[in-house]
Amino acid sequence: MTKKPDLNDPVLRAKLAKGMGHNYYGEPAWPNDLLYISPVVILGTIACNVGLAVLEPSMIGEPADPFATPLEILPEWYFFPVFQILRTVPNKLLGVLLMVSVPTGLLTVPFLENVNKFQNPFRRPVATTVFLIGTVIALWLGIGATLPIDKSLTLGLF
């Protein structure tokens, strides 16, 4: 339900005459946003990307040498937690079951949470706790995947 302005109100008419109130009742997208603001944002984004590419060019990587194999081949960074699970669990079937249990556990969170109508994370303690614990475990596994196998579980701290 939207509030409709009373255009017979003299206070509102005075505000509208001064140009006030256009944000409250909406502002047309044409021509203000689409003609003036959007091209500036698009060109600014392109300029930032080109500037970063020119000022800080990234290297493609080391040239390939077919006669020298690296000691340990690491996957891409987003596969580090999965790689760490498969590397540390002795039974590969158990490792696959652990990987399947992650999305399965995430699917059960809405059913465990009784107050799922709230968007505030402080009013959804189960979902917030699952998220925080999952984030810490994923970071721990991801950092551990970059270390040698004997230091990977303790991250070299103990």
Swiss-Prot record:
Subcellular location: Plastid, Chloroplast thylakoid membrane
InterPro entries: Cyt_b/b6_C (IPR005798), Cyt_b/b6_C_sf (IPR036150), Cyt_b6/f_cplx_suIV (IPR005870), Cytochrome_b_C_euk/bac (IPR048260)
Principal location class: plastid
Top-level taxon of the source organism: Eukaryota
GO cellular component, one term: chloroplast thylakoid membrane
Keywords per UniProt: Chloroplast, Electron transport, Membrane, Photosynthesis, Plastid, Thylakoid, Transmembrane, Transmembrane helix, Transport
Gene Ontology BP terms: photosynthetic electron transport chain
GO molecular function terms attached to this record: electron transporter, transferring electrons within cytochrome b6/f complex of photosystem II activity; electron transporter, transferring electrons within the cyclic electron transport pathway of photosynthesis activity; oxidoreductase activity
CDD domains in the cross-refs: cytochrome_b_C
Transmembrane segments: 34-54, 93-113, 129-149
Similarity comment: Belongs to the cytochrome b family. PetD subfamily.
Name of this protein: Cytochrome b6-f complex subunit 4
